[in-house]
Amino acid sequence: SEMCIRDSYYAYAMKCKNKFVSSWFGFNLIINNVLVAFTARKYKMDIASLIVGDTEICEALRTSGARDFGLSGEVECLEQLVKISETEELVEREKKIDQLRWNWMEEMTFFDYFTGERLFVFLLQLEMIERWIILDKEKGSQLFRSIIAELKDEVQIPAEFR
């Protein structure tokens, strides 16, 4: 089934030997599941059947009746996710989700300068920017200019390659 494929996708990705990649997929699993759980609760849907994955957090989302699903100490960004889940306007909601992801990537690669992880983050950020250029040309262009400026600050290109 579709749910089984999603479970397998995340399980496989979270076993990646690259710590950043496995953390990235774990982080996205948390974001997606928590937002699904809040939305399902709001519309009185069966939460358990909508949660993807087999982690302790997934189990808490499936079984807890607590307002925060008992995850306040477990999920660092829970309060942000609560606020995002309360955002009715969909484009604004998407922007907040991407901002959360963007901040997480920046935090996780703060000390990585020109590593594979930093390149992966750069590609993920370009993907986000591409989406936002389509949705909001001004904001997307701004993001693109800021990431290029940041790259110029980060990377020292040898004179012979300039």
Q: Where are the regions a protein language model picked out?
A:
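Extended alpha-helical surfaces
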Residues: S1-E2, R6-R162
